Every structure is written in C-alpha cells, then in structure tokens.
C-alpha cells in the first residue's frame, strides 16, 4: 500500500509542475546534471538535461525526486529535457526484483572469465533484453513524459567488446542467429558475429524505446524529440566498445545526437611518425569530425560536448590546457553551432582536484579558471554558423564504417592494429601538416551529399568491412564521375575471411575489396599502382595504413601519392602543407598550431583582439600562438553595429538588456561563488558605471582603441544589475 500511495503522490506532484509540453525550444546550449537547482551550478545555458528518474548512480548526494528536480530548474527559467543511460543507470529496482519480482543481475555484460562489467556498485553494463526495455518504457519514459518533458536523451549505447559470455547474451544469440552461441575468442568469425549482435541489440533498444516515447507523447498531444548522446566512432573503436553509431541517424525516431568528446576521450594515445603519445587537439578534431560527418547528410541535429575537467582525477592546469584544445577543435567545424557546454556542473564547480601535478593538495576550481570557463561557454551562446572555411587544402576524406568496432577485441592470428593505427595512419600524416582531413561514413554513401566535397577518398579494409554491397556501387559511381580513390591495404587481416555477403549467397570473393575493384573494371587483386575508371582514378597501395604511422618516416610514399593524386588527378590545386589551422566565425578568430609538423613557427593573428582564454580579457593588436597552443579571440573590428552598446565577452549571461539615449543596462547572471569579468562595447567612455546601484567607474578600465570598458564583480545567479551612462 505504501508503494501505491507513493506513486499516486508522484502523479499529483507531476501534474502540479507540468513543464507545459514545450513545443519548439530552439535550444542552442544545454548541460546535464543529476542535482536540483543550486546557486553554485546555475550556468545559464538554454536548457538542462535532468539526469535519471532516480538520478545518476555515481552521485552519492541526497537525492530529490525527479519531479522535484525538474521543478527546481523550471522555476529558474530553464527548458527541461531528460537524460539517462541506455546501457547503465539507476535501475536497481529492475536488477533486484522490484520491477517484476525477479532478479536480473544476470543480464549484465560478462567477460570470458565470468566477471560482470560494472559501471558502479550494483550498476552493471546491460545486455538490453526485451524485458529491460519494457521496464525502461514503463518506469522511466512514461514518467518523464507525464511531467511534460518533450526531449529525451538516451546516452551511451555501449557493449564492451570483451563481453559476450553471459547467459542473457547467449539467449539473444540463439534468437538472432538461430543457432547456438559461439565463443568470440575462438575465431575471427565468432568475434565478427558477436560484434554484429552487440551492435544490433542497442540498435533495437534505441529504436524500441524512442518509438514508444514518440507514440506515448503523441497520445498526450506532445511532439517528443529523441537524441543519442554518444562517444565518437573513433573513440569507441579505440576503447573497444561496440555501439550502433551511424546507423541510428537513419531511424525516423532519432532526432539527433550529442557528440561526447572531451579530454578523457581525446587524450587516448595514438601513433604518429613512430611515436605513441597523447595528441589531444588532433584526436578531438577527428572525433568531432566523425560525429559531424555521421549526421551531416541526414540533417539530424548535433550538439558538440566539451568538459572543463574529465573523469580521471588530475590537476587544474592539466584540465585547463586540454579543455582549450578540445574547445578549439569543436569550433573548427563551422556548420555546427549547438553545444552541451558541460556535463555534471556539480563535479566541476564543487569537486576537489589537485592544485598541481606534483601535489596531493586538492581544492575547488580556481577562480581564474571558473571565470575563463564561463567566458568560453557564454561565447557558445553567441557562436554563429558561418560559411567561412577552415584554412588548408580541402577535399581529403577518410572512409569509416561502424565495423571498425568489430575488429578491435580479441585479436586473431597475430594481426594487431595498435591504438587504431590503421585509421590514424590515413588521417594524421595529412592532419599534422595542416590539411583539414574529413571523415565519411560508409553507411551514409547512399546520400548524394556524402561525397560531395571529397576530391580524394582514403580507404582501407584492414580495420573494417562493408556491411552491405551497395556501398561499393556508390564508391564506383563517384570514381567514374571523376573522384580519386586511394586504397591502402594488404587485405590479409583475419577478418577478410569471415562469412559475409562477399563470400555467400552466390558471391565468391576472397576479400570485400575484390568486389569493389570489380565494380570499377579492375582485377580482383590489382597490384600496387594507378588505374583509371571513367573520369576518375584508383590508386592501390599494398601497405596497411598502420605502417604509415608506426614507423618514423613511414608516411613518405603515402604523402607523395596523396599529393600527386590531389594535384594531378583530382586537379584540386596545390596541396599545401603548414603547421596551423585558422577559422573566422563571425566576430571570433580561432587558431591552432601543431607540434610534430612541418615547422615550429608560431602563427599570428592581427586585429583588435580580446583573448577569451585569458580570464582578464586583455586586448591585443597581435596575438602569437605557438606550437601546441590554441586561441579563441574576439575581433572587435568585425563586430556588427559598433555604435550599439553591447557585451562582447563575459563570464555571465545577460538578460533584460535595455538601451536609451546615453545609457545601457542589463542583468548579469552566473553561478554563485564565481567571479565575473566582462568587456562591454560603448560609443564613448562612460561617466558612470553602477553595479547593483553602486558606483564603480574607474577611468583606467576604459580601453579607447577598442571602445570597451572592462568590468569585474562577484557573480550572482539571481542577477547583478549593471548600468553604463555616458
């Protein structure tokens, strides 16, 4: 009886705090939290993704009900969305029998040694059974929609490659394949079959849950949007996790993604020029790129995530350096302008982390860093789309496939692909020389836009396989019309021989590439060399691309051919090598200078520049960026409507802006216990500056050349009233 009474009470509460079935929200910035509103985490994004009906299992704080948490954020003016995990979460009532009277801990993902893979205490990574999906729909999705939330984010559909040994997985195997389970470690074919099933299970899970959410929402007069926050294909492949990724973009029930890229994913080491090391900026650039290209042809919405810290405990200086690298990388994609500005603000603003790499002393976020971070995320609130392009020779794309995740673990027959070197071997030799390499997903080749901007397509089947033969028709048609294909590969990895479409049902090809080459009139095993097909060219290199980066200087021949194919065959112009990237986005200048590149020269940006990576917001006429560094600058010279008083850069968000003859005022909101700094553009030097009615004018804070006034004060989530008179 108590449980029934509790559920009825929640229903009444839900009715009382309905978020009025938000229609079109136009959310540009968002964040996720399992906490109720607190002054110290009120970062003023457009929306908040309230995490979990039962919260976040990693959050040990006193937990309010979902409805109470929703109400607390709604009262502060936020658009309310919902996020939870699809592979793990606060689902103990399911695992311990409260849902249907049966325990379900046996539905966790299990390794060869019989160990369950845990996300936390009593929180296993899940084999998503039909019963579990019913639980998610009934206990979670319904409750969220009943409160009036009309955007659902189901994050991290993850099946570990090392898993696949539980009884629940064996049952799913029998249902899917029609024959008994086979241990994945015993053969490449078993590994491939196991990975395909893992891929399918989360494809089915998201399709079922999202389809239900949309139908249930429709029954209540709501248009429910559904999104998948997910790591990139690059990261999941490197971390040996299987996830549906690109295939989800074609589902009508999927409205978009969050690209979960941050320091923790991008600092995963890779090889280049024979050296294994962290390359945070370069990896982040490729991660964001793989997420953009996954959805670009489909028109789905994409949020890019950055995190000012990471899951692994490090020091504040490390967090700052790598945050700047990932933040810059995301902004180099001018066609994306929606952002998750941070995950878990409670962890960022209130967590304790080391003060230096060599110290065990821990402190909360330093004021200078919280100020800088808030300046950066408020820039995201203003960040425009742009038709400007990133500098560098355009037109190189690396082909990717979801099956990249299928060959990572376990290895067979001694064939290794260290740190995803077969992928990085095609991308880093060019990216490190200032060429803005893009990625293309083989699953998207049916969209005519997929290869529209590609001049030279780089591909291999050493680390992935085509799941459908139709992709080869699309590639062949593209080459015939003038495209240039560089195929690198010995085609001797153990997955070439798995039972798949190229060697079954009337097909008898030794390798999938043999089928591709046949489409273009080539022999099944063309020797290394250059071949013509229609107006295009096929260049075959009988080397696995991992060898381009595993050895010092191993990319010389690849680069020679890439340049010749680009300039002579694709007729795309001179292939330019440099050590930097630069992009203009509206008022903003973005720059990144590479280490391990063609030179150690710095890159210089000139103009009237506000440095947004410096919490003092200094102004420069020239900003020098050294190798290994990045810059986010606001160029005052490009600001539209210079006679209009406006905040150019700020560690707060402005509301209630008003302008009159000789005055300008606004209310600044930002988290408590943080410091504000703002550069405000004014037509002339002010005579009066007030903060909450108190006069604070200081002539030394006026910068005549930029016509900006620098103002600083303590932040307040309730708002600080600022007024300028001149």
PLM region descriptions:
Residues 465-661, 678-680:
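A conserved amphipathic helix/loop scaffold
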Residues 42-43, 417-503, 548, 598-599, ...:
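Helical hinge/lid and interdomain linker segments adjacent to catalytic or ligand-binding clefts
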Residues 49-61, 117-135, 187-205, 232, ...:
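The substrate-binding groove and active-site-proximal loops of carbohydrate-active enzymes
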Residues 25-33, 81-85, 153-157, 192-241, ...:
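Aromatic-lined carbohydrate-recognition surfaces of secreted/lumenal glycan-active proteins
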Residues 41-44, 51-52, 155, 217, ...:
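Hydrophobic targeting/anchoring helices
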Residues 26-68, 72, 142-151, 252-257, ...:
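Catalytic domains of carbohydrate-active enzymes, especially glycoside hydrolases
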Residues 65-119, 150-161, 217-228:
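Glycine-rich, aromatic-flanked loop segments that form ligand/cofactor-binding clefts
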Residues 82-147, 181-199, 207:
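Active-site-adjacent "subsite" loops/lids of carbohydrate-active enzymes
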């Amino acid at each position: 009886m108590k449980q029934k009474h509790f559920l009825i009470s929640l229903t009444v509460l839900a009715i009382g705090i309905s978020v009025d079935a938000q229609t079109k929200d136009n959310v540009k910035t968002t964040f996720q939290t399992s906490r109720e509103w607190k002054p110290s985490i009120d970062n003023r994004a457009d929306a908040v993704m309230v995490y979990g009906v039962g919260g976040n299992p990693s959050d040990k704080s006193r937990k309010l009900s979902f409805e109470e948490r929703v109400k607390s954020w709604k009262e502060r003016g936020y658009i309310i969305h919902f996020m939870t995990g699809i592979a793990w979460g606060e689902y103990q009532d399911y695992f311990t029998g409260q849902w249907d009277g049966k325990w379900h801990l046996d539905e966790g993902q299990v390794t060869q040694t019989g160990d369950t893979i845990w996300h936390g205490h009593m929180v296993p990574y899940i084999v998503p059974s039909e019963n579990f999906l019913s639980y998610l729909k009934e206990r979670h999705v319904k409750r969220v929609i009943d409160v009036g939330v009309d955007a659902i984010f189901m994050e991290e559909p993850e099946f570990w490659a090392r898993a696949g040994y539980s009884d629940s997985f064996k049952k799913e195997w029998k249902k899917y394949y029609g024959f008994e389970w086979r241990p994945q470690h015993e053969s490449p074919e078993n590994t491939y079959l196991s990975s395909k099933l893992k891929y399918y299970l989360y494809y089915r899970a998201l399709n079922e849950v999202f389809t239900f959410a949309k139908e249930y929402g429709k029954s209540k007069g709501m248009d429910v949007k559904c999104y998948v926050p997910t790591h990139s294909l690059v990261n999941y492949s490197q971390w040996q996790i299987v996830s549906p990724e690109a295939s989800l973009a074609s589902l009508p029930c999927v409205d978009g993604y969050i690209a979960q890229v941050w320091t923790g994913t991008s600092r995963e080491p890779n090889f280049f020029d024979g050296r294994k090391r962290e390359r945070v900026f370069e990896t982040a650039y490729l991660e964001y790129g793989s997420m953009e290209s996954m959805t670009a042809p489909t028109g789905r919405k994409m949020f890019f995530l950055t995190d000012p810290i990471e899951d692994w405990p490090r020091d504040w200086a490390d967090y700052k350096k790598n945050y700047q690298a990932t933040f810059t990388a995301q902004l180099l994609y001018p066609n994306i302008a929606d952002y998750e500005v941070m995950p878990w603000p409670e962890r960022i603003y209130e967590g304790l982390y080391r003060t230096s790499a060599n110290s065990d002393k821990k402190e909360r976020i330093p004021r200078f860093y919280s100020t800088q971070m808030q300046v950066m995320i408020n820039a995201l609130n203003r960040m425009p789309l742009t038709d400007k392009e990133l500098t560098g020779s355009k037109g190189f794309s690396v082909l990717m496939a979801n099956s990249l995740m299928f060959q990572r673990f376990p290895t067979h027959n001694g064939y290794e692909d260290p740190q995803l070197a077969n992928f990085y071997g095609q991308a880093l030799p060019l990216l490190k020389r200032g060429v803005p390499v893009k990625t293309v997903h083989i699953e998207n080749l049916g969209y005519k836009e997929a290869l529209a901007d590609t001049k030279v397509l780089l591909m291999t089947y050493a680390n992935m396989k085509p799941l459908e033969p139709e992709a080869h028709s699309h590639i062949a048609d593209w080459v015939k019309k003038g495209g240039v294909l560089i195929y690198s590969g010995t085609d001797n990895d153990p997955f070439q021989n798995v039972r798949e479409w190229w060697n079954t049902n009337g097909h008898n090809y030794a390798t999938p590439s043999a089928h591709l080459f046949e489409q273009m009139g080539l022999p099944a095993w063309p020797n290394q060399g250059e071949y013509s097909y229609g107006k295009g060219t096929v260049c075959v290199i009988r080397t696995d691309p991992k060898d381009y980066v595993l050895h010092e200087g191993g990319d010389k021949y690849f680069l020679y051919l890439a340049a010749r194919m680009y300039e002579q065959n694709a007729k795309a112009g001179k292939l330019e090598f440099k050590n930097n990237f630069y992009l203009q986005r509206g008022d903003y200048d973005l720059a990144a200078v590479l280490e391990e590149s063609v030179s150690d020269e710095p890159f210089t940006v000139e103009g009237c520049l506000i440095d947004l990576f410096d919490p003092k917001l200094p102004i420069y006429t020239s900003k020098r960026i050294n190798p290994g560094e990045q810059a986010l600058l606001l160029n005052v010279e490009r600001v539209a409507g210079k006679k209009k008083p406006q905040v150019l850069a700020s560690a707060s968000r402005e509301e209630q802006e008003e302008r009159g003859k000789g005055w300008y005022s606004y209310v600044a909101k930002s988290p408590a216990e943080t410091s504000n700094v703002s550069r405000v553009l004014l037509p002339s030097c002010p005579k009066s500056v007030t903060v909450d009615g108190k006069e604070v004018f200081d002539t030394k804070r006026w910068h005549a050349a930029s016509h900006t006034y620098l103002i600083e004060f303590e932040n307040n989530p309730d708002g600080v009233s600022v007024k300028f008179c001149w």
